[in-house]
Amino acid sequence: MLKVSAVLCVCAAAWCSQSLAAAAAVAAAVGRSDGGNFLDDKQWLTTISQYDKEVGQWNKFRDEVEDDDFRTWSPGKPFDQALDPAKDPCLKMKCSRHKVCIAQDYQTAVCISHRRLTHRMKEAGVDHRQWRGPILSTCKQCPVVYPSPVCGSDGHTYSFQCKLEYQACVLGKQISVKCEGHCPCPSDKPTSTSRNVKRACSDLEFREVANRLRDWFKALHESGSQNKKTKTLLRPERSRFDTSILPICKDSLGWMFNRLDTNYDLLLDQSELRSIYLDKNEQCTKAFFNSCDTYKDSLISNNEWCYCFQRQQDPPCQTELSNIQKRQGVKKLLGQYIPLCDEDGYYKPTQCHGSVGQCWCVDRYGNEVMGSRINGVADCAIDFEISGDFASGDFHEWTDDEDDEDDIMNDEDEIEDDDEDEGDDDDGGDDHDGYI
């Protein structure tokens, strides 16, 4: 009888201690100013000095390469399995969903996704079920020093060069220092005027800004395209977005527009463009985007964005024609589409592909007019030269060649579903499902 009583007392004490610990954790979360939400924690938010925004505003475009070693954590980092549970730093760490806390010492803890943790274990040749201790890492750890930002060749900003070298070692990639300071790199041509003196930027300076930004967007695009699932993970609301209206420019320019357009309204306001204004001494960057706003409504539409960059480059038709001639060499490839250029090097309104017998209408930059492609000669009497006609006050539908066939299939399925819903609405009267 005494043994049974002792066992009951021990169980009751253990249950009480667990209840008190749970209550203390809940009270700590409620007592915090952020309500236990790590997205509201100041350490996760951007600062005024880095992005010129108010403290307490979540910046979706902060450089994730530098975020708490999420991307750079590897099983090779020290891991002490004999940590005192009372001093476990993970007790103070709030990880998001699908992530686990890994304690490296008494003061360092990082949140690692389950998938990334398993992937890193496989790369290291260690089964996560058999992991019993640290793995020797060949990547040199960086000391704590005063930040000296550098821009890497992958388009990301690093707090100092050692961080860049460590990131390259962990990822097994070749990353070099492109310039000192934040990305994008400034032009090589020094400015002789004072930084406080506002002046008008020349066309040559606008072209340099456009080329520099285009190179930066390309580096970011190529770096982000290595993981095709990133687009789906980072843009969960894309399925609610009308994909029939997309930037008419392709590749990195259209990709960057979609990344900046955080509210999916096909317009870039000043808060969305502010992520690009990283170099305070570069006066022509903001002036360049101001020149893109042809409607002067403080908004840049998808078409204004594309044409603003396109008009700052060499004549597009002549450039494409020269590239085709270089690829062909002496031999002329059968079935090759040859663009028709005007005397200024821009595209003629009517373009035809003789091998397939189709013609279509384009603007002077080669952007195809939706619905104009037919078998035979197209009637392209309208002048599609743009100087703000398709700006933020006027939407036009364009197709995006980068969309996958699955996306096109999904769009067709959605159209069929909409038709069925319309039929149901006609039969059901005034019933609504809550969507407009």
From Swiss-Prot:
The keyword Amino-acid biosynthesis belongs to this UniProt entry's keyword annotation: no
Alphabetical keyword list: Calcium, Disulfide bond, Extracellular matrix, Glycoprotein, Heparan sulfate, Metalloenzyme inhibitor, Metalloprotease inhibitor, Protease inhibitor, Proteoglycan, Secreted, Signal
Segments crossing the lipid bilayer: none
SUPFAM superfamilies in UniProt: EF-hand, Kazal-type serine protease inhibitors, Thyroglobulin type-1 domain
SMART domains associated with the record: KAZAL, TY
Sequence ranges of Acidic residues compositional bias: 399-430
Positions bearing carbohydrate: 387, 392
Post-translational modification remark: Contains chondroitin sulfate and heparan sulfate O-linked oligosaccharides.
UniProt entry tagged with the keyword Calcium: yes
Reported tissue expression: Expressed in brain.
Protein name (record): Testican-3
Species name: Pongo abelii
